[in-house]
Amino acid sequence: MIDLRKVRNFYIACGYIDLRLGIDGLAAVVKQQYGSHFDEESLFLFCGRRTDRIKALYWCGDGYILLYKRLSNGRFQWPRSEAELRLLDPQSFRWLMEGLRIEQKTAIRKGKPRDLF
């Protein structure tokens, strides 16, 4: 089974992908289009034109695991600008899964130190 705590590299395939592709098709896209290789620390994420569903491909050591998530309400904030493979940190992955953008502005503005009394 997949343990997301062991995943160190979250790769997001920016742009559109045909979500009718299964394990073999998505693995071929990763290897041929992006020139990347699978390991047990990497999870590859894909999104189609409808941004309410994504697929994730993970190599668990003895085979592939294909994960599929469809939102019942809302859409993923998926980057569409480039057809590239982008590496996300775990925080950006959590933001994406929670429906937020992966590039967040600063949530709390920096302040200046001041006297409290």
State where each predicted segment sits.
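Polybasic/polar functional segments that serve as interface/processing modules
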Residues: 1-117
